[in-house]
Every structure is written in structure tokens, then in C-alpha cells.
């Protein structure tokens, strides 16, 4: 009894390892929102305080007319009103982030009030988590509308990051279409954070603009490309000197060149590389996992079930097409086989098999006694015959063959 209770006891801390991004992202968004407020206040302070001091001194010294003083004060009031509107928008955004964080904390807190894995409340909590993981998978795969609809139907909009992934997909798609405007705007908004990034997204975007100017072959565009390189590429000379030298060499090669690395620089596939690079950079800045959470959740179970035969290049001579396609092994299924390919094999030090294994003509192996008992319970099998519980096929008992394990 004690062993059973121990095996079903819920360890909340282990479960929460998978759900760290659930709280990490709102924290990162709140931090960035606060930084935006700081920048706005600092920028306006740098303008308003000197302007106010200058206007006051000019008024006291009577070096400007009252109308000029009023105009200067009106300009400052207008700027402060603009600051107020921006601050109100940021405050509303902060309230949304805090409300979302509160819902997520409440969701995770429920786990600490569930004593056992057998508790019905755990099934309910797990269902919500599964819905979250599916929405995350759909968002990362580009099915944004379906993800939004599922989140609305399950009432988990505060538990998933819809807006973040929708913005990410929008910019990634614009890059695949050959547009850099949205991505460069995003880089400008996150300039400070990008300095700490391991990726060189802004440089790659500026380099692509340079390549597109040269691709035209127009003399005016070539002059513009050189000016573009001096303005946007030269600042990266310390970290990207090799790329900048290759970019300079690109001026001597036409777009249909076969010489590498210039052929690759002209290749349309570079846009897909930029799109993937943006997604990786975006996820890094927001502390999002590079892999879908559903894959991470499945990986432990896949590894526990995986055996060398699951990805073997050789199939058993006794196996046929029917036994392969109806396999009960989740690793061998078409849905999970590729996902499990790079997973480590399960570490089994002992094998657990029936004491009287037999093999049926279709290649499936069962314990003889249990198979006979199951066939009797079915009731629709003639005497002297057995029914495969997986495929439903019926065979004569004489067709069963003993299995010997070496």
C-alpha cells in the first residue's frame, strides 16, 4: 500500500520544469515594458528641463516676447501630453501582463493542491496543459488562426502566448517574401537587447539589403550599395570582418555567377535563412525554448520506450505489412518515428517477457496462456482457434510456434 502511494504521489516541482516559460515570458515582457517607460521619461526629461530653464531665463531677462514664451510653454505642454498618452498605453500593456501572470500563477498553483496522480483534478490540470502545448505547437507551425480558435474554445488565452507568436510569424513571413522593413523595425526596438545576442541578425539584414542593391546591376544602385555598406556594415567590422570582405568582393560578380561564396550570397534561399535566424533571435530575446514544448514533453516518454529495432534498417523476416502498419509501439508509428530518431535508447537492464511466449503467423508474439484465456473470453472464437487481440485475425492453435530467447 505504501509503495503504491509513493508511486502515485505527485511531485509538483518536477512537473513545473516543463512550465518555466509560462512565467518567464510575462516577466520578460514586463521588464521590456518598464525599460520602454524609462527611455520615454529620460528622453522627455532631457528635452523639457533644459527647454524650461531656457524659457524661464529668457522671460526673466526679457530677451523674448511674451508670445514667444507662451509658444515655448505650449510646445512643452504638447510634448508632455504626448508623453502622458504613451505612458497610459504602456500602463494598459503592463496591466494586461500582470493579469496574464496572475492567471498563470493560479494555474501552476493548482498543481500544489493535487496530492496524487490518480486524483481526478490532476486529469483536469493535465488536459489544460495538453491544450496549452497543442496551441504552442500550432503557433510555432504557423497555424495561428486555428491556434486562436482552440485557445478561445478552451478558455486558455491567458495561458498561451498568442500575440508574441503572431508577431513573430508575421515578421518571419515578411522575410520569406523578401521584405526587411518589419524585421529592421523590430531590431531597432530591441537594439539594446540585440547587443547581448549570440546572433548577428541586424548585420545579416543590412547585408541582404546590400546584396539586393548589387543584384540589380544598375550603376546608381551600385553607388548606393557602397554608401549603404559604409553606413551600416562598417560598424560591424570588428566582429564580421570576413563577411564584410566577401560583401566587398560581391561588387565584382554578377548575380548569375557560379563562383562561391558569391553564388550562395545571391541565392534566394538566403531569405529563408534570414527568416529562421529572426525566429531564433526572437526566441532567444524572449527566453522562449527553441523547440516546441510538446516535443520536449514527449521526449522523455519517447526515450523510455525507444529500442534499437524502432529505427533499424532491417525488419524482422516474420514481419509483414499488416503487422508493421498496425504496430502498437508509439516509436514505430508514423507520427512519432521521426521525432524520436535522435532520442537516446531506453536503458533496460532487465527484460520482462511472458514465461511461455509464442509467435503467430502474422509475426506477433504473445504469452500462450494469456492468449488462450483472452480468446475464450471473446467467446466468438471456435474451439482450437485463437484470436490476435491487436489485429483481430483468427488462427489455428496448431499454427502457433514457441519462441526461444537466446
UniProtKB/Swiss-Prot annotation:
Pfam families named in the record: CTLH
Cellular localisation: Cytoplasm; Nucleus
Alphabetic keyword roster: Cytoplasm, Metal-binding, Nucleus, Zinc, Zinc-finger
SMART domains, alphabetized: CRA, CTLH
Main location: cytoplasm
Cellular-component GO terms for this entry: cytoplasm; GID complex; nucleus
GO biological process annotation, one example: negative regulation of gluconeogenesis
Zinc finger feature spans (RING-Gid-type): 329-391
Keyword check for Zinc: yes
Start and end residues of each CTLH domain: 164-221
Source organism, top-level taxon: Eukaryota
Gene Ontology molecular function terms on file: ubiquitin protein ligase activity; zinc ion binding
LisH domain ranges (all copies): 126-158
Chain segments annotated as transmembrane: none
PANTHER family documented for this protein: E3 UBIQUITIN-PROTEIN TRANSFERASE MAEA (PTHR12170:SF2), MACROPHAGE ERYTHROBLAST ATTACHER-RELATED (PTHR12170)
Known role: Involved in the proteasome-dependent degradation of fructose-1,6-bisphosphatase.
Protein family according to the UniProt entry: Belongs to the FYV10 family.
Protein name: Protein fyv10
Organism per entry: Aspergillus terreus (strain NIH 2624 / FGSC A1156)
Record gene name: fyv10
Amino acid at each position: 500500500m505504501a509503495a503504491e502511494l509513493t508511486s502515485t504521489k505527485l511531485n509538483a516541482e518536477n512537473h513545473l520544469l516543463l512550465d518555466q516559460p509560462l512565467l518567464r515570458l510575462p516577466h520578460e515582457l514586463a521588464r521590456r515594458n518598464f525599460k520602454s517607460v524609462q527611455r520615454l521619461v529620460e528622453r522627455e526629461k532631457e528635452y523639457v528641463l533644459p527647454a524650461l530653464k531656457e524659457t524661464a531665463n529668457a522671460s526673466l531677462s526679457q530677451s523674448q516676447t511674451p508670445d514667444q514664451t507662451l509658444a515655448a510653454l505650449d510646445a512643452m505642454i504638447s510634448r508632455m501630453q504626448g508623453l502622458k498618452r504613451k505612458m497610459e498605453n504602456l500602463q494598459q500593456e503592463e496591466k494586461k501582463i500582470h493579469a496574464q501572470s496572475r492567471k498563470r500563477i493560479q494555474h501552476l498553483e493548482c498543481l500544489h493542491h493535487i496530492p496524487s496522480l490518480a486524483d481526478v483534478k490532476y486529469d483536469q490540470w493535465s488536459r489544460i496543459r495538453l491544450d496549452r502545448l497543442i496551441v504552442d505547437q500550432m503557433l510555432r507551425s504557423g497555424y495561428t488562426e486555428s491556434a486562436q480558435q482552440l485557445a478561445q474554445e478552451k478558455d486558455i488565452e491567458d495561458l498561451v502566448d498568442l500575440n508574441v507568436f503572431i508577431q513573430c510569424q508575421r515578421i518571419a513571413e515578411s522575410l520569406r517574401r523578401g521584405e526587411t522593413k518589419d524585421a529592421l523595425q523590430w531590431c531597432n526596438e530591441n537594439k539594446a537587447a540585440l547587443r547581448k545576442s549570440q546572433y548577428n541578425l541586424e548585420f545579416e539584414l543590412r547585408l541582404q539589403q546590400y546584396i539586393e542593391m548589387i543584384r540589380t546591376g544598375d550603376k546608381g544602385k551600385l553607388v548606393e550599395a557602397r554608401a549603404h555598406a559604409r553606413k551600416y556594415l562598417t560598424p560591424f567590422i570588428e566582429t564580421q570582418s570576413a563577411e564584410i570582405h566577401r560583401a566587398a568582393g560581391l561588387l565584382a560578380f554578377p548575380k548569375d555567377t557560379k563562383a562561391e561564396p558569391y553564388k550562395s550570397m545571391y541565392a534566394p534561399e538566403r531569405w529563408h535563412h534570414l527568416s529562421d535566424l529572426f525566429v531564433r533571435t526572437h526566441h532567444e530575446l524572449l527566453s522562449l525554448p527553441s523547440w516546441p514544448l510538446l516535443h520536449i514533453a514527449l521526449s522523455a516518454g519517447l526515450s523510455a520506450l525507444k529500442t534499437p529495432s524502432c529505427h533499424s534498417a532491417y525488419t524482422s523476416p516474420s514481419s509483414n505489412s499488416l503487422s508493421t502498419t498496425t504496430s502498437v509501439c508509439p516509436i514505430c508509428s508514423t507520427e512519432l518515428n521521426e521525432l524520436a530518431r535522435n532520442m537516446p535508447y531506453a536503458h533496460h537492464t532487465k527484460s520482462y517477457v511472458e514465461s511461455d511466449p509464442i509467435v503467430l503467423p502474422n509475426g506477433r508474439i504473445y504469452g500462450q496462456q494469456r492468449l488462450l484465456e483472452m480468446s475464450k473470453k471473446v467467446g466468438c472464437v471456435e474451439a482450437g482457434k485463437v484470436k490476435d487481440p491487436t489485429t483481430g485475425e483468427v488462427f489455428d492453435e496448431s499454427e502457433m510456434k514457441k519462441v526461444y530467447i537466446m
